[in-house]
């Protein structure tokens, strides 16, 4: 299955934990790649893609293709991967190493856009003697416009829906010792209940919580928005106490009428969560779908195709609280 489940297993390496710093430079650790099937010569490569076919995603969804072998002929492969949309907008690729190509427009997708990923890799040489075998189209739909802005200094998360404030929620972000990344992050996974173990993200035995409710992944290195039933109620809206995640008030087992339960039910894969006023640096562009933190010139510079992408010069994403 070459859909989002396989992709996320590769991106996250199975790690579920609050916080996590990625590699030594703050980027996500290099992602292992799925092993290719045994094939006859010449060896082949596949592209594992996200979002999934037929899915409805948020306006911040970035198309990601992970390759089962390292790509050295990047321009040839990139020309075999295009993204079209209705209504049409220019979409440009950006390489994060030899096994990952992300593609996005200059600004977030408009609600209702139908996006199609065209994989025309059959017979394309990705490296010396290594050829692609895929030829397929994958379409998904962009849903309503929801984005949230976490002000780490004010301990609030403002949820916007179609340009209007939907709700302001009190939060607890990363503690002074374990600060939360700034920048635009994208929800990539949702767990109604999951286990979070500090050893999976570099915190050793500092915590092991078997039933974290309403958890939504923001980075490959382990940043989540999730419910928190173990902190006293006064913490939310007044103090930052987490290991880098964004905590919302919840109850054990998760409750639909809690702040965390409400936000979980309102959110879909591809929604953006932007953190501002944290003392930490901006999240790396390859840590999950962090590519919105590159401006358009920086993004297009990561393409292997030298022709003018013909996209308008534009700011990436919105300033805080706007669209």
Where on the chain are the PLM-derived regions?
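Acidic, low-complexity Ser/Thr/Gly/Pro-rich repeat segments typical of extracellular/periplasmic
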Residues: 4-7, 11-14, 19-144, 310-317
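Post-signal peptide N-terminal regions of Sec-secreted extracellular proteins
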Residues: 40-45, 139-141, 146, 164, ...
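Short, flexible surface segments
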Residues: 59, 111, 181-182, 269
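Short, solvent-exposed loop/turn elements at domain surfaces
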Residues: 73-76, 157-159, 194-198, 225-226
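Short, charged beta-turn/beta-strand-edge "cap" motif at the junction between a beta-strand
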Residues: 121-124, 163, 193, 278-282
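Exported/periplasmic cell-wall-interacting domains
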Residues: 144-145, 198-323
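Compositionally biased low-complexity segments at domain edges in trafficked proteins
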Residues: 146-172
